[in-house]
Amino acid sequence: MSKFSRRAMLRAGLLTAAAAAVTACASTAPQNQTPAAPVASTPSGTSSQPVTIAHWDWWVTQGPTIDNEIKLFHEKYPNVTVQKTTQVVDQYPNLLQLAMKAGTAPDLFLIPSTPQLVEQVDEGWLKPLNQWATDKWQATFPAESFAEGSNVFQGKIYTAPFDGPAPWLQLYVNDKLFKAAGLVDASGKVEAPRTWSEVRVAAQAITKAGGGNVFGWGFGDKQKTVLPWQLMLCQTSGAPDAQGGFDLRKGSYTWSSNPVFLDWINFFMGMKGEGSIVPEALSIDDETARVYFATGKFAMLIGGVWNQSGWAKTNPDFTDYSVVSLPHLGEKPDSYFYTSPGGVGFGVSNQTKIPDAAWLWFSWLNSKEAATRWVQAGQGLRIFPDANKLEFAKTEPYRQYMQVALDGVRMAPSPGLLHPTMDQVKPQQTLPDIQGILEGIYTSQIKDWKGALLDLQNRDDAAQAAAIKDAQSRGINVDPAWWRVPDWNLTENYVQKGAK
């Protein structure tokens, strides 16, 4: 996934009411506590006395895999306890921010996309890792895993890439419902849609065959984060950043000027108007939507690889589904999901009183061995190519996911590698954002679709320009031209010119 999209992913999280966040923080109890810690050869600075590492993430379906790592870690380091707290995803940024302010931050935490990583560094949330992350340790990772402006700032390393390059969203197809609607080839194999028009035709056929009880398409946006996932069909249709709206080829936001976004709204609202989308879409959450899909309530769902481990837990008998890349507007993809040098995963808190133990756990989670177990558990790809072998897939849907992941990513430009001061430009969020606009369109509160997109584009462009001007006023050398890479071909890997 491009770092531009990651930046937008949890943006809405900071909008949660502070009072509600305080209540949630006070009432949240660790969901998993498994003993784990220092080895016979204890890391420097860590005593052999019992130590407890506070670990935060927002992973639910990935939880059992992390629990297994805690168990294995404990077997090797019996004096350390990893106390894991799994927070609610849409509250996570607020809860972490409140913990930082209160001085009660976890020792190790999964880094959220909001605030931006550079802002978290500036706020002093993260501990530099250089004293442990030696050249030898860095060499265990693929080339370009550590990059200035991504996970390194002013020469200091703050995190390591966790996920491997992969489209973070795919289309899941309920094979049983497709077969019931006759959407199969001559051999009886399900014909999964490749284009938007094929999606719409399939959705109509499935809804008709369901007689009012089954629908072609579904999602769950109760937590107000999933509507933009539907918009991600633009990511393979000519939008380099379908979630954030910024286009490096233009050096500006293109919500209105790139016609693909309005094309998608017409397509999606057309499906809604035809009655092909599950009616409860705005009142159920994503986890409920996944159960609906597994129990045959609707036939097509956008989601990530976490769906598969989730179904293994909630609907263990459900295996009759397929995984394909996100359908595109035309016959071929006009763009892809993108990656760039560097990457983000876990971080060690600057407030930790047990930095050596926290690093030990950080290093364990970022080892090749743990990465291989992650892939074998069906949790997705990791940064280490040797861990991402198709032979590790234990089910056909997971093998399909791995194939989609291995084929569906391209390298994007990384102007921040050439101009590190770009990370000092921090645009303010404008509201309503794309989530709010899509919700307004979906509920018919917004009727001028193009006007709403143009307004968002203008507001985002103005925020970007203001942030650049603010950085310049602080004496930071930044040039608006750095945000423009006109020679980027969206269908090919970009070779960074002048990269060191």
Residue spans for each PLM region:
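Hinge/lid segment of periplasmic solute-binding proteins
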Residues: 114-170, 228-231, 322-325, 497-500
